[in-house]
UniProtKB/Swiss-Prot annotation:
Region (Required for DVL/RTFL small polypeptide activity) location: 15-46
Listed transmembrane segments: 8-24
Subcellular localization, as worded in the UniProt entry: Cell membrane
GO biological process, alphabetically ordered: negative regulation of cell population proliferation; shoot system development
Name the UniProt record assigns to this protein: Small polypeptide DEVIL 5
């Protein structure tokens, strides 16, 4: 019984870290897209 409790805690921790990693990756992707759009608009304006 004790081993199952620790394994559940481990899976929760893995899911939490994966969730945070996904959020960070999503933020980086959004920043990358916005940066690309700004560069394209600036180059197009010239």
């Amino acid at each position: 019984m004790k081993t199952t409790g620790s394994s559940v805690g481990g899976t929760k921790r893995k899911m939490w870290s994966r969730g945070v990693g996904g959020v960070v990756r999503e933020q980086k992707a959004k920043l990358y897209i916005i940066r690309r759009c700004v560069v394209m608009l600036l180059c197009w304006h010239d």
